[in-house]
């Protein structure tokens, strides 16, 4: 198979290879490396590519297998490091106190919101309802829900920033 024909088969799926690698490896650098390695593997099998009915599926399988191999290698090396540097999984007391304090502040801020904004914020950001469910519960249209949610988030953000910057400015 000539290089041009190979590239005609691979270029359309190159972006999908990268996105799959990025999703599995969660690092752009690792995903780029994986993409290059997969393309090299496909090039080494270029004479067999014409026998595959779906080149894209074959490329995705090669990508998945390569990424899983990389994750296994990384996991094994991480296990060695963890055994050598074992640390307690218990959250430090200071961090726990800070998180509890921050949650109390957030609760007070949410309680100070207008009732409609508080309800929509609770339904969308805390309980993870979608807009259709919120519209059904509140008898509001999607635009009004988005506006109220945006205002609630903005008010929360501004009050948290004001709290965090207290005494600094």
Where do the PLM segments sit?
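DNA-recognition helix of helix-turn-helix
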Residues: 137-162
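Short helix-coil-helix linker/hinge
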Residues: 100, 110-117
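Residues within helix-turn-helix
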Residues: 29, 132, 143
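A short pre-motif secondary-structure segment
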Residues: 120-124
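Structural recognition of an alpha-helix C-terminal capping motif at a helix-to-coil junction
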Residues: 19, 33-40, 44, 53-65
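A short, charge-rich alpha-helical start-of-domain segment used by transcription regulators
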Residues: 1-19, 32, 43
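Short, basic, alpha-helical segments at the C-terminal edge of helix-turn-helix-like DNA-binding modules
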Residues: 162-169
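Internal acidic/polar
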Residues: 69, 77-103, 108, 130-133
